[in-house]
Amino acid sequence: MEGFGEFESRPSKDKIKILKGTTTVGLVVKDAVILAADRRASAGFFVANKMVRKIVYIDDRIGMTTAGSVADLQFIYNYMKNIYHYNLISGNRPVTVKSLATYLTNILSQNKYFPYLVQILMGGYDTQPRLFNLDYLGDMTEETYVATGSGSPVAMGVLEDGYSPDLTGDQAMDLAARAVMSAIKRDSFTGTGVIVTKITKEGHVEREIYPNRKEAM
């Protein structure tokens, strides 16, 4: 059609590559959701920041891992926090992990032709532990364990070998951290250390692990 010769209905391959420079992990066990992510931010082959936080919290029992464009992620995070607190103030139905993930996937799908360049794991505990994987086109899948990003092939192998739904929360934290640490050893876009969090009905507990210095609590 005349006038639309330069229009691209899908994002370019160069833009899609932005999503791949990290490693994030999520898994569900009996009484908890575990999220883990490395701390390196890369711009191409340049290490832009060594101490980036890639796990954020919508509330004490709902968290997200973040990968992709920093500006888009900041917008999505602030937007979802506002939606969550608006629903609490309004006194509507309880805000569940699935309802938040569904709301976000609708936002991403509506903007698929000019997408937010993000890859998100959303996990939390409402009546039970839940974990959802969302991509920039608005696809959403519920997972029991998952790894995303450039280091995901390495991390997924560790999860496949060690995952069981009967793991305790602390055992699952160790497994998630080990999966990301394995990716750090083999993937140049994953680095510095790991933040790992355990989310239960009581709230979340977080640990930081670094290969070359003492673990920080």
Curated annotation (Swiss-Prot):
Gene: psmB1
Record-level Gene Ontology MF annotations: threonine-type endopeptidase activity
E.C. number(s) listed in UniProt: 3.4.25.1
Keywords annotated in UniProt: Autocatalytic cleavage, Cytoplasm, Hydrolase, Protease, Proteasome, Threonine protease, Zymogen
Protein name, per record: Proteasome subunit beta 1
Species of the source: Metallosphaera sedula (strain ATCC 51363 / DSM 5348 / JCM 9185 / NBRC 15509 / TH2)
Location within or outside the cell: Cytoplasm
Source superkingdom: Archaea
UniProt keyword Hydrolase present: yes
Disulfide bridge positions per record: none
A GO cellular-component term linked to this record: cytoplasm
Activity control note: The formation of the proteasomal ATPase PAN-20S proteasome complex, via the docking of the C-termini of PAN into the intersubunit pockets in the alpha-rings, triggers opening of the gate for substrate entry. Interconversion between the open-gate and close-gate conformations leads to a dynamic regulation of the 20S proteasome proteolysis activity.
